[in-house]
Amino acid sequence: MKKLAILLTLALCAALSGCGRPAPSLGGGAPVPQEPAGSVASSGEPDDPAPPAGGQTATLYIGTKAKGFAEYPMTYQGELTPEALIQGIADLTGWDLTLAGEVVSGKGGMSVCLSNKSALFTGPPEPQKEEFFVFGLDDLAETLLDSIQKTLQEGFTLEGGDPDALDIWYSVEGERPLELPGLGLSWPIDQPYQWESAVITG
């Protein structure tokens, strides 16, 4: 019995001495992969994408001076140009707004030269976009010309200025006055455009 007590005492001492040993270093073990701080697992549909870096917004105006205009946003990169606004109207409406040259800007106004390939001479696209449906050449011509005029005036008038003070002149290829034989109307090349100032030629 005395021997058994001695053996139990020795075993207890050995166990206690083992508990005092330093823990083995974890430095040599394989690293445990962890999620990067702040990362979140993707699930479901992504949120609406942010606008392109450096993108800016301009406004397109579609309609007529007589009936009013609807406004549509257009995103663009870099410097805003008259050609970019006119192309924006074309992309939005489906109308062919091919130009015969660059828009010429001068003191107090801009000169827009339309190509013979433009919708003003070839008609609206087929099929037309329902939102921009026009009835006949007269409706198309007034809407097209007024929309370009209004969009350029609003786009290039400084804050606090009067958009109507920015005159817009129209001409066609060959630096000829704008004339629409199908409607019997023309506009003098040396006078700013106003739909109601058309000269009746037919």
Give residue spans per PLM region.
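Bimodal "functional hotspot" detector
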Residues: A5-L8, G18-G202
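Bacterial Sec-type N-terminal signal peptides, specifically the leucine/valine-rich hydrophobic h-region
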Residues: C13-L16
